[in-house]
């Protein structure tokens, strides 16, 4: 599908196509926040695990809903918080969405809480450390 916006032509994928979901996931990994955050967080000491959760991860995994306004990021470890926020601000400029990091120690992440149970029971996009 395409449409004109001023002098630009905007092209979007057809969600009814069987190729839509696989192509969306490929683009998300190679050119989206997953790739940018993976590269940036690889340079920060103390990060054991990092992943995108919330509505952005859900839409990327094919869960229906409204388009996400921001990116929720879970960082597990003992990184320098200012380095985490600095990386998030830099990546925000490229993805044109605010990134909201939550930083937890490994013990805090292992604890049982309603918030963490919700995070664990919904789709994620791994950045560092793989799936939950």
Region annotations inferred by a language model:
Residues 54:
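Active-site glycine-centered loops adjacent to acidic/histidine catalytic or metal-binding residues
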